Amino acid sequence: MTNPLYHKHIISINDLNRDDLESVLHVADKLKQHPNSQLLKDKVIASCFFEASTRTRLSFETAIHRLGASVVGFADGSNTSLGKKGETLADTISVLRTYADAIVIRHPQEGAARLASEFAGDIPVINAGDGANQHPSQTLLDLFTIKETQGRLDNLNIAMVGDLKYGRTVHSLAQALAKFTGNHLYFIAPKVLAMPEHILHLLEEHGVEYSQHETVDEVMSELDILYMTRVQKERLDPSEYANVKAQFILTSADLVNVKDNLKILHPLPRIDEITTDVDNTPYAYYFQQAGNGIYARQALLALVLNKNLVL
């Protein structure tokens, strides 16, 4: 039976239905047990990062190597023909499709990954983050981590805290959780950084329960997952950043009356929104979460490049 993700562009988490998500998580679990497979031997993956990245780029490249493939690309778009000579993204992708079997792209402009897919032909494009829009591979590792720690993706109380306006990770995660049942999402942010209306409307269309708050204290005791985010200085004007950067800081003292199964996640990098004393609590799981990025991205690459994947 042909794998439905074969040669599929992964631009938005909404490109994947629940069955697709569960397939990726199943393969990720198998690869976590046996990470050094050769599922992509002799394949070449283009890693094109037009925007700064540490974890996403390095975990993708680690995933590529562990699958037996080779990686070509760049970590600084300003040193490419697009950055130096004014080449269009369309032309860049039209050339890269002749070099590689798949293209992983991060770009500061919303919609850039979708545009790239339109010029890639049958070469799958994986969005590694486009502006404040989507970050589907981060969402897959988030879902994998939630399932790993909670044993399920349904009937959970999940809080997302901090920058919900510009944070592409929470946009994608909220949309993904809408594909599962019985979850309650708590959105905790200052009004200036609230979850965008189009995300709220999507949740309403799917019958997802959610509530909005300005402090985490009122819901902390109910939570299974606390998903912290940093206030993104690079996407705010200085006065706006100064007003909100210290509004949501989690310390170990905040974790007194929490559920035993609570896990704290964060897409990283952390600045000062989680103090280091939280790291040594049994609830901190953000470094393990980052490590899971390798397996989720291995699974995604293996599925889009293997017509009949059996594990």
Swiss-Prot record:
Pathway assigned in UniProt: Pyrimidine metabolism; UMP biosynthesis via de novo pathway; (S)-dihydroorotate from bicarbonate: step 2/3
PROSITE patterns in UniProt: CARBAMOYLTRANSFERASE
Residues that, per the record, bind carbamoyl phosphate: 55-56, 106, 135, 138, 268-269
Reactions the enzyme catalyzes: carbamoyl phosphate + L-aspartate = N-carbamoyl-L-aspartate + phosphate + H(+)
Domain of life: Bacteria
Gene Ontology terms: biological process: 'de novo' pyrimidine nucleobase biosynthetic process; 'de novo' UMP biosynthetic process; amino acid metabolic process
Class of the enzyme per the UniProt entry, highest EC level: transferase
InterPro entries assigned to the protein according to its UniProt record, in alphabetical order: Asp/Orn_carbamoyltranf_P-bd (IPR006132), Asp/Orn_carbamoylTrfase (IPR006130), Asp/Orn_carbamoylTrfase_sf (IPR036901), Asp_carbamoyltransf (IPR002082), Asp_carbamoyltransf_Asp/Orn-bd (IPR006131)
Assigned EC number: 2.1.3.2
Pfam families for this protein: OTCace, OTCace_N
Binding site for L-aspartate: 85, 168, 230
Protein purpose: Catalyzes the condensation of carbamoyl phosphate and aspartate to form carbamoyl aspartate and inorganic phosphate, the committed step in the de novo pyrimidine nucleotide biosynthesis pathway.
UniProt family annotation: Belongs to the aspartate/ornithine carbamoyltransferase superfamily. ATCase family.
Subunit structure: Heterododecamer (2C3:3R2) of six catalytic PyrB chains organized as two trimers (C3), and six regulatory PyrI chains organized as three dimers (R2).
Protein name, UniProt field: Aspartate carbamoyltransferase catalytic subunit
Upper classification of the organism: Bacteria, Pseudomonadati, Pseudomonadota, Gammaproteobacteria, Enterobacterales
Annotated gene: pyrB
